[in-house]
Structure formats: C-alpha cells, structure tokens
Design a protein with these regions (language model features):
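Charged, alpha-helix-forming regions
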Residues: 1-267
C-alpha cells in the first residue's frame, strides 16, 4: 500500500504571511493530527497492533521546515552514505543544505539558524501509537520523527540519527518526494505526467507495453495516428528529464515499447 506523505496529512502547512498577530500566534500553537488510517501500514503499527496513531508538535511550515524534512529523508534513505549501527549518518552541512533544495548563496549564519530552528521543530513532533485506549491494558508508545541531530558548524557537519521504528515511514516519504520531483519537472506536460504514474507503477522488468495500452491510459479521442504521436512525444519527455530509457518495437503493424530502465531520482 502506498504511503501517505506527512504533508498531505497537514503536518506541513503554508506559511502565514499575515500581519494579524492573533492569527500568526495561533499558527504557532501546534497541531495534533489523527493519522491512524494513513499510517497503520507502518511495521510498528502492524506488528504491535496499535489502533490509533497521532502526530503532534509545533506546526511545520512549507518554506523551511518541509525543505529540511526532504533533506533529512534524502539522507536517511541514501544507501550510498555510510552509517553506523544505529543508522547515524554524518554529511557536510553544505551538501545537506543542497539536499534540502536551498541555493548555495543561502549558507549564511542567519540561514544556519533557520535550519537549526527547523530541526528543533521537527524533533519536537512526536508520533504517538496507542491501543486499548481508556482500558486498564492501554499501551501508548511515543516516537520522535527523528532520533537525534547535531549541527557542527566548525567541522561543517550535520549528523542525523533516525528513529529506528520509523524506517518505513522515511522510505515511503522518499518515494513520494521522487514522484513530486518528476511531476514538477513535467509541469504542464499532462500526457507525460499520466504516463509517468502509469510506468512507475509497472512491476520490475515489465513485458513490452503496447501503444494501445498507453493510448488507453491517456484516454485520447483524436485519430490513431495523432494519438500515437502524443504517446511518443510523452515518452520522449520522460526520457528528456532523465527518468526513462526505452525502445520502440515494431512487428508488422503492431507497436510496443520495451521499458529498459526507470530512474526515479532523475539522475
């Protein structure tokens, strides 16, 4: 089952540019979100039978906190990076900032403070798992969004430790981030977006996909020759953003496409 990203749960909200002090103050109060339906597939919830899952803590914004979260996710799910037995990973501060999507020009002292604020807020968010609430066999488990974090300016380092029980949450979030990145790269290219979601859901080493299947997926109404060129153009756009490697196969008047490789990270 696919993971629901934390941002769709409303954990991250747009920054209020309001001059109204009362509203701004209220937005800092924090949030308590019922995520039972969306996070019940997590290993911890399944293995220990937790029925209710909530996320509570300071409200997180899209401007900085969400970007820092994407940086954390990209570090904690990167198998190329060296980690010790509890999953702790050390990375250069400048590289961490780039993984968050911040430009190089932003690495000033004030910006470092912003990243520290975001880490503090993210670590103050707690995922609460509970079962048999209100009975005398009630069990409640509290897990921080991330285990530990260190910002070491002198050594140009950010050190992150995951919460072990949330490993599958990180992996699910990462998949969603890759998807968002691809869809952003395909802005206003609706046919390519639709084929992206279709191709990404295919199993590993898929059998060739007929052009008819692609046409059906796009629900096109134009004449077949035009539909075929729409499909080819969309596949070419997926190739251009670095997502897809494919080959067109022709046999008689049958046309199909062999999916050679998918690169969700658009490398």
């Amino acid at each position: 089952s696919s993971t629901v990203p934390l941002m769709r749960l409303g954990v991250f909200v747009p920054t209020l540019k309001s001059t109204n002090k009362a509203i701004a103050k209220k937005s800092n109060v924090g949030s308590n979100i019922n995520a039972s339906d969306d996070l019940r597939h997590l290993e911890l919830a399944k293995s220990e039978g937790f029925e209710r899952i909530t996320i509570s803590g300071p409200r997180l914004d899209m401007d900085t906190d969400f970007k820092v979260w994407t940086g954390i996710i990209s570090v904690l799910t990167d198998n190329e990076l060296e980690s010790n037995e509890d999953g702790t990973i050390s990375i250069r501060f400048t590289e961490f900032a780039m993984r968050c999507g911040f430009s190089r020009g932003r690495l000033k002292a004030e910006f470092r403070e912003k990243i520290k604020d975001s880490l503090r807020k993210l670590m103050s968010n707690v995922v609460e798992f509970s079962k048999d609430r209100g009975t005398n066999i009630e069990v409640t488990k509290f897990v921080q969004l991330i285990g530990e974090s260190t910002v070491d300016i002198g050594n140009d380092k950010v050190i992150l430790t995951p919460s072990k029980t949330l490993k599958d949450l990180y992996v699910g979030e990462y998949k969603i981030l890759l998807k968002l990145r691809a869809l952003k790269a395909l802005a206003r290219k609706e046919s390519a977006q639709a084929l992206y979601t279709f191709i990404e859901a295919l199993p590993p080493n898929p059998i060739p996909v007929s052009i008819e299947r692609f046409r059906k997926r796009l629900s096109l109404t134009s004449r077949p020759a035009l539909q075929n060129s729409t499909v080819r153009k969309a596949l070419k756009q997926l190739e251009d953003i670095g997502y897809l490697e494919y080959q067109e196969l022709k046999e008689g008047n049958k046309i199909a496409f062999q999916i050679i490789k998918r690169n969700p990270s658009l490398k």
